[in-house]
């Protein structure tokens, strides 16, 4: 997370978030094969990336890519690491899951009937957000004239809880 705070502190206008992906024929690939090095997996990387995105985006810095972009046969060169073709979407999905968790933590109901306008944000890639929330006891439905969450307010609350007074100074 330190690099996120540094990007904000130094006045970056835009950033790219690239977790370590090991490619064939690299020095890291050799170390990986020998068991000397292992990159974080997808879940561990998502746990870091959503927080980085929250910090950077919340400071008004544009995040213009998340994850390495590989095309066609280049994907076959991935040896290890958190490569996913929709990594940016997964990070934003995780952030929306955190919004639901924050809503619940702050006294929201176990059953949330969100306005249909939230459906795209709170469904997620392969229904990740609503399925994970449901597994945690937070049931999400969508309907006309449903609850309209102030997402930015929840993101600010998460930022403050995550970083305390540090974030307020960036």
Feature locations, PLM:
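Catalytic cores of alpha/beta
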Residues: 1-9
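Short loop/turn motifs at secondary-structure junctions
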Residues: 8-11, 108
């Amino acid at each position: 997370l330190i690099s996120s705070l540094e990007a904000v502190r130094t006045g970056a206008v835009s950033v790219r978030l690239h977790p370590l992906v090991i490619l064939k024929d690299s020095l890291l690939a050799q170390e990986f094969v020998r068991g000397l090095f292992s990159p974080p997996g997808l879940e561990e990387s998502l746990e870091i990336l959503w927080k980085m995105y929250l910090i950077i985006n919340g400071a008004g810095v544009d995040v213009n890519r998340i994850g390495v972009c590989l095309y066609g046969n280049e994907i076959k060169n991935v040896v290890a690491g958190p490569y996913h073709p929709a990594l940016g979407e997964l990070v934003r999905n995780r952030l929306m899951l955190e919004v639901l968790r924050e809503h619940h933590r702050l006294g929201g109901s176990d059953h949330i009937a969100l306005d249909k306008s939230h459906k795209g944000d709170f469904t997620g890639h392969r229904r990740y957000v609503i399925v994970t929330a449901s597994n945690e006891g937070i049931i999400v439905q969508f309907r006309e004239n449903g609850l309209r969450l102030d997402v930015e307010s929840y993101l600010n609350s998460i930022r403050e809880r995550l970083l305390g007074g540090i974030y307020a100074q960036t």
